[in-house]
Amino acid sequence: MKNEYLLLTPGPLSTSETVREAMLKDWCTWDDEYNKDIVEVIRTKLVKLATKHSGYTSVLMQGSGTASVEATIGSAIGKEGKLLVVDNGAYGARIAQIAAYLNIPCHVVSPGETSQPHLNEVETALASDPAITHVAIVHCETTTGMLNPIEAFASVAKAHGKVVILDAMSSFGGIPIDIAELGIDFMISSANKCIQGVPGFGFVIAKQTELEKCQGQARSLSLDLYDQWHCMEVNHGKWRFTSPTHTVRAFYQALLELEQEGGIEARHNRYQTNQKTLVAGMRSLGFEPLLSDDLHSPIITSFYSPTHSDYQFKAFYTRLKEQGFVIYPGKVSNADCFRIGNIGEVYPADIERLIGAIEKAMYWQVA
């Protein structure tokens, strides 16, 4: 079945027809055919995508990507622990909100939504507060489309002996990284982002020695990261509670298609071409990105809304959807913007068609 329109969003996103077709069969969660041949293969493939070094493992968690973030924050940080988190967008702020809900002390570094974190501020906080045990940062902050400097951030954190948590929700699978070489202890992502699967579960790729320290620390039964991992380890892919079988099988197919494309490097190149084609085309129509080009990620781009008095996002959105494209509203608190994603089953030719559709949808310029 074909899609009526292309989702130009940061996920859920447009998937291939073969990924969707993979969900047309039912699976028994007790069978080796599911647990060993699908779940365990996924777990192994994820680790290999994240690092070429040994010592890492992976665990899948039911729910949204935020559920996996909360599972990590709530399991990795002990009762005497304290978190430092960078908040330069909605998703960094969400990590701080999770810490508040879980009564975890939290130091928030807030450089603003259009700025990268100032590493000297992070350095000062870590040097002056020995109670901080863990640090967290979002790799691609899709509030704006900014790519944060995770290598420098992790280097500062490791120099102070901290456990590093990376929210790579919207970047893993689309931007090459080696989490072992970066010193990342826990990396979190989701099925419905750059791997190009469908929603239903997230996953955590972790240094096994750090994950084992999580035993008995969870603040939630269903979000107990260690217990979920231990169950999968002992029972060869078995989930503690009902797993999203169709989503898991679709993700397996999506991983195969990532390999067929040429791996993360090839996908990153496609996403980059999409993004550069998008920005050039939008500028030709008079739109300007929110961020300077050096801060852009290949994942999603924020554009300033037109200042014309007749412009309304909903009307613009509707005209684009009628032409087969769905874009995203803005999420920046101090600027009127909208966002266009570059990821999913989207190619440069699609972006070129989008630019033509946007030109036709600019109703406020009609004389």
UniProtKB/Swiss-Prot annotation:
InterPro entries xref list: Aminotrans_V_dom, NH2EtPonate_pyrv_transaminase, PyrdxlP-dep_Trfase, PyrdxlP-dep_Trfase_major, PyrdxlP-dep_Trfase_small, SP_NH2Trfase/AEP_transaminase
Catalytic activity: (2-aminoethyl)phosphonate + pyruvate = phosphonoacetaldehyde + L-alanine
Keywords: Aminotransferase, Pyridoxal phosphate, Pyruvate, Transferase
Listed name of the protein: 2-aminoethylphosphonate--pyruvate transaminase
One BP annotation, GO: organic phosphonate catabolic process
Function: Involved in phosphonate degradation.
GO MF terms, alphabetically ordered: 2-aminoethylphosphonate-pyruvate transaminase activity
Species of provenance: Vibrio vulnificus (strain YJ016)
